[in-house]
Amino acid sequence: MGYYSLTEVTAVQYAKEHGYFEKKANVVCHEIGDGNLNYVFKLDDGVKSIIIKQALPYAKVVGESWPLSIKRATIESKALQIFAKYVPEYVPVVYSHDEELAVTVIEDLSRLTITRKGLIDGEEYPLLSQHIGRFLANVLFYTSDFGLQSEEKRVLEGTFVNPDLCKITEDLVFTDPFGHYDTNDYESELQLAVDELWSDKILKLKVAQYKYKFLTRKEALIHGDLHTGSIFSSPSETKVIDPEFATYGPFGFDIGQFIANLLLNALSREEEQRGVLFFHIEKTWSYFVETFTKLWIGEGVEAYTKEKQWLPIILQNIFTDAVGFAGCELIRRTIGLAHVADLEEITNKETRIQAKKQAISLGKELIKYESKNADIQLFRTLFQQTVSGGIKA
């Protein structure tokens, strides 16, 4: 039959045909997706529920003028299964994948909240940083040359060649926000800050280097889009979702993106409410280092993991990259194509513009920063130096 786009009606038919519900079951189905690239259906018969996710052959955020390969759904399904091999507690269960229809049937996580929404609403997730730090350490270590035999790594790397979505990252994170491109989207009040950004040749040279790292450093399997909208949370659980951007890339990329999105939330808060975000930034890194170090010592398969002075160099490189990638993410989420609710939902326009100017300034500082040691306090320090006072909604 070939590919066709599901509707709420045909999603139920699909689920019944594939044995997820009885033929006579009264299944309620709603399209709940709020992302840019897919349909997401929740199906519930009152006894059990599932999620059906279907990749569209174009970007929803733009329309059919921006075609995309539906093979990204297979990438996403395989990435979730790889993650589950090492950290099953931090990802949803994948029940099945249909490559022809680009459909993946996965666990319903409705008991949890999208982390971005929860943070905006003031919810607290005390284990978020512990879980994300451990998730990243395990996935990055075990899919790298340090935790995987080189032959196996090369085969796995070939599985995650993801040209369409990598091109989106190349353009929307590293290129378009730093020049005159039609994809950019920002208020006129930001024009002066944007002009200064675009004319900063030192900054653009640094961005070029980070883009080159993304293009060439195939260090480990990365999620590729690890923002707070790609994580479900509760006070006791954390689940990473939506790895359709998964590819082999730099160790520091996911760490930087996650930290940047915590910083964006911090920018939306009054000063006295920001401490929890810096707690999570700092604990994410400390749990990452602790877990990665244990794996390096106990599970390392590469000969030079026995050299004690090698690990600190690797961790320093990861940190340096994470700082720069975080800066790029801050700027793209402020003036690029895909904005974030953390800033967009600040109701007072003057305050919202102020927060966006601060995001641009902080992003520039992070990109330009020359880190000589992996001091996670750097994010708090640069934030305090760049941002004065609190945000008043």
From Swiss-Prot:
InterPro entries associated with the record: Aminoglycoside_PTrfase (IPR002575), Kinase-like_dom_sf (IPR011009), Methylthioribose_kinase (IPR009212)
Gene Ontology molecular function terms on file: ATP binding; S-methyl-5-thioribose kinase activity
One Pfam family cited in the UniProt record for this chain: APH
Catalysed reaction, written as an equation: 5-(methylsulfanyl)-D-ribose + ATP = 5-(methylsulfanyl)-alpha-D-ribose 1-phosphate + ADP + H(+)
Keywords carried by this UniProt record: Amino-acid biosynthesis, ATP-binding, Kinase, Methionine biosynthesis, Nucleotide-binding, Transferase
Binding site for substrate: 225, 332
Pathway: Amino-acid biosynthesis; L-methionine biosynthesis via salvage pathway; S-methyl-5-thio-alpha-D-ribose 1-phosphate from S-methyl-5'-thioadenosine (hydrolase route): step 2/2
Enzyme Commission number(s) of this protein: 2.7.1.100
Residues binding ATP: 38, 53, 107-109, 242-244
Coiled coil: none
Domain of life, per lineage: Bacteria
Gene Ontology terms describing biological process: L-methionine salvage from methylthioadenosine
Cleaved signal peptide residues: none
Function summary: Catalyzes the phosphorylation of methylthioribose into methylthioribose-1-phosphate.
PANTHER family given in the database record: METHYLTHIORIBOSE KINASE
Subunit structure: Homodimer.
Family affiliation: Belongs to the methylthioribose kinase family.
Protein name, per record: Methylthioribose kinase
Natural source organism: Bacillus thuringiensis subsp. konkukian (strain 97-27)
Gene field: mtnK
